Amino acid sequence: MRDDQVLVSGLIAACREIIAAHADHLSELDRAIGDGDHGTNMRRGCEAVYADRDRFSQMPLAQAIEEIGLTLVLTIGGASGPLYGTLLMEIGRRLAAGGEADFSAALTGAVEAVARRGRAQRGEKTLLDVLYPVQDEVIRRHALSAIAERAETSATLTVGMKALRGRASFLGERSIGHMDPGARSCALLTSAICHYLKEHRAA
Ligand code: ADP
Ligand code: MG
């Protein structure tokens, strides 16, 4: 297998593993401020990608990322499926277009696309409250361990926020005091990806 085939396959396995290990907790977080399905949704998406990992790892990296995004849209469902799907499809497209060979530029454009899709911005207690800080760290070319740490602390910071988007917004003030499930899944995935890259690739 080529290096990037091993990379794609390994990253898919690492993401699937972390979501499987935390699916119950993600659903528990979603039970507090949503409808309790976020762990099930994320697990379904990651299992579908994992089942097709050989096909993805045959593709050029940018195409694999885009196709994984499409699979996530079709399998995660809920509000988070189209958002995670948009993120990956946009990263893949931007990398493939070549004009943005730089990963941080592709990520920045993709995070903007997620924000447009969710009509959301920073501070509204969603997965964007992890994506934006991660994007900032990537732009500054911080070390992988720093990116992972920032993702974790950013998810924790959603505890104090009032939800303004998605189901949790129906709770208004009562959403304060709970961590946003999408922010948590986003931190878990970021952390799994950073740790995998740190172990298998120079930063
Ligand atoms: P659903 O809310 O449809 O049950 P999930 O439970 O899978 O979907 O996902 C909920 C997560 O999706 C939230 O915790 C939040 O992070 C994210 N989310 C929901 N709506 C939006 C939005 N409009 N913009 C950004 N993120 C959102
Ligand atoms: Mg839900």
Predicted ranges, named:
Residues 1-203:
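N-terminal loops that bind phosphate or other acidic moieties
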